[in-house]
């Protein structure tokens, strides 16, 4: 499972002109699922993400988590995180999970974040989405579990 995590002051997902999810200060998470991933992988990543200290403390050091600041998460499924461009110029996505598995584990990941007390906005799995964000820092971290 792979997550590209961006610290944001706000982020919003829109599908066909309707807002499907948003957050104020917190995290935008682009989530990719691989064939070997499981519900346990999703829960492990959610726990890591909730405790990831990428928010500044009073001294300006990255020492606070999204839980510590009372922030939220906008979670977006993105199979393209497993693109392989090693052969030619057109990406291959054979490293990504099947749509069925991806949908199930995306839902499991979001449920695990909520179980940890985080408010979670969501994109729409498999849809063409417009994502707006204000990256704070910028701070962008990649997590592979």
UniProtKB/Swiss-Prot annotation:
Keywords: Cytoplasm, Hydrolase, RNA-binding, tRNA-binding
Gene Ontology biological process terms in this record: D-amino acid catabolic process; tRNA metabolic process
UniProt motif Gly-cisPro motif, important for rejection of L-amino acids: location: 137-138
Alphabetized PANTHER family for the sequence: D-AMINOACYL-TRNA DEACYLASE 1 (PTHR10472:SF5), D-TYROSYL-TRNA TYR DEACYLASE (PTHR10472)
Annotated family: Belongs to the DTD family.
UniProt function note: An aminoacyl-tRNA editing enzyme that deacylates mischarged D-aminoacyl-tRNAs. Also deacylates mischarged glycyl-tRNA(Ala), protecting cells against glycine mischarging by AlaRS. Acts via tRNA-based rather than protein-based catalysis; rejects L-amino acids rather than detecting D-amino acids in the active site. By recycling D-aminoacyl-tRNA to D-amino acids and free tRNA molecules, this enzyme counteracts the toxicity associated with the formation of D-aminoacyl-tRNA entities in vivo and helps enforce protein L-homochirality.
Quaternary data: Homodimer.
Protein name, as recorded: D-aminoacyl-tRNA deacylase
């Amino acid at each position: 499972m792979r997550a590209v995590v961006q610290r944001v002051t706000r982020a919003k997902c829109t599908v066909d002109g309707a807002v499907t999810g948003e957050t104020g200060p917190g995290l935008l998470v682009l989530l990719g699922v691989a064939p070997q991933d499981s519900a346990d992988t999703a829960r492990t990543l959610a726990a890591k993400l909730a405790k990831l200290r990428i928010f500044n403390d009073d001294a300006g050091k990255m020492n606070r988590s999204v839980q510590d600041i009372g922030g939220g998460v906008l979670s977006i499924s993105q199979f393209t995180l497993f693109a392989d461009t090693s052969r030619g110029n057109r990406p291959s996505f054979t490293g990504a999970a099947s749509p069925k598995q991806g949908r199930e584990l995306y839902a499991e990941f979001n449920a695990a974040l909520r179980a940890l007390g985080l408010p979670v906005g969501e994109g729409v799995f498999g849809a063409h989405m417009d994502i707006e964000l204000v990256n704070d820092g910028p701070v962008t971290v990649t997590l592979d579990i």
